[in-house]
Curated annotation (Swiss-Prot):
It is found in: Secreted. Belongs to the cysteine-rich repeat secretory protein family. PROSITE patterns: GNK2. It comes from the Eukaryota. Keywords: Repeat, Secreted, Signal. One of its GO terms (cellular component) is extracellular region. Residues 33-136, 142-253 form the Gnk2-homologous domain. This is Cysteine-rich repeat secretory protein 42. InterPro entries: CRR_secretory_protein, GNK2, GNK2_sf. Residues 1-26 form the signal peptide.
Length: 256
């Protein structure tokens, strides 16, 4: 099983340092590029091919009629061998009108960074976008993850790790609760805060909405196991996958 976990550690430190220089209000408005991956296993499509036409149709459609109310859409176009599957997910506090700008940015960013790739993923601060020639609905992606961490450490690392992990685990249970609904739809997102000594930790967890609640918890459980590798004693950190992610900081980073 391959993974890109940890492959952007240098980028992580630079990105976090830049983010920390912004005010809280500015952070809430940023949509920084974080990472991307172009699939080498799915190959490339030819210009003017049926796959390209299907992809163009889907990408132009999702930016105009996407389900921005809940910040998620999974759609497909075409027939085998030219099937195109596209998924986008906006951050839990970036639904409705806050979602379309991120998706539009992601579409142009993915085209520029992974030209003609049949499979690709791009992450921004407020959304992710995935294109593929392979169906992935309700399937956890275990192969594509990475982390960003604050280069600065807490003084009491042991206590901080224990309490932050407990907060994230609590949020994972809440996000994947089958009774955590918006109407009839699973929310698959939770945010919270906790005081640890003199500091307050703010955190969130989220799954993509193609997952059922049991798959959501399974995904979150998997990335939370990477907390020691990502975030041991760090003042802030996040682990991103395609199917789920978590983040914590010592400052508010979510919209109300």
């Amino acid at each position: 099983m391959s993974s890109v976990f940890g492959s952007v550690h240098i980028l992580a430190m630079i990105a976090i340092q830049l983010l920390l220089t912004h005010s809280v209000s500015s952070l809430n408005l940023t949509n920084a590029y974080l990472h991307h991956k172009c699939s080498n296993t799915q190959g490339k499509y030819k210009q003017g091919s049926a796959f390209e036409k299907n992809l163009n149709l889907v990408l132009s459609t999702i930016t105009s009629i996407g389900n921005f109310r809940d910040g998620f859409r999974y759609t497909e176009e075409g027939e085998d061998p030219n099937n195109v599957f596209v998924m986008f997910q906006c951050r839990g506090d970036s639904y409705w009108s806050k979602c379309p700008p991120c998706i539009s940015t992601a579409v142009s960013g993915l085209r520029r960074r992974c030209p003609r790739n049949k499979g690709a993923i791009i992450w921004y601060d407020q959304c992710l976008l995935k294109i593929s020639s392979v169906a992935s609905f309700n399937k956890i992606d275990y192969e594509n993850d990475f982390y960003l961490s604050n280069p600065n450490n807490m003084s009491d690392r042991g206590l901080f790790n224990k309490e932050t992990s407990a907060l994230l685990e609590k949020l994972a249970y809440k996000a994947s609760d089958r009774n955590n609904l918006d109407g009839k739809q699973l929310v698959l997102y939770a945010a919270g805060e906790k005081r640890i000594g003199t500091k307050k930790v703010y955190a969130m967890v989220q799954c993509t909405k193609d997952l059922i609640f049991t798959k959501c918890f399974e995904c979150l459980e998997g990335i939370l196991r990477k907390f020691p590798q990502c975030c041991d004693g760090k003042r802030g950190g996040r682990v991103f996958g395609t199917s789920c992610n978590f983040r914590y900081e010592l400052y508010p980073f979510l919209r109300n």
